[in-house]
UniProtKB/Swiss-Prot annotation:
It comes from Agalychnis spurrelli (Gliding leaf frog). It comes from the Eukaryota. This is Dermaseptin-SP5. Disulfide bonds: none annotated. Keywords: Amidation, Cleavage on pair of basic residues, Membrane, Secreted, Signal, Target cell membrane, Target membrane. Residues 26-46 are annotated as: Disordered.
Amino acid sequence: MAFLKKSLFLVLFLGLVSLSMCEEEKRENEVEEEQEDDEQSELRRSLRSSIKDMAAAAGRAALNAVNGIVNPGEQ
């Protein structure tokens, strides 16, 4: 009977250790996914900012070109 108790405790202990390791791995994966999401968000934000800056520069250049055509002597 004592042998069965020891075996049962050993099985339960190993199961808990295995479960603990799985939970830890799951948490690590979630952290990695969050970091990837943060990096992607930051990349999108910087890309939007760059596009916005380029569009503003293109708009100013176009406005200056139109002003140069409409008012050739002024600048």
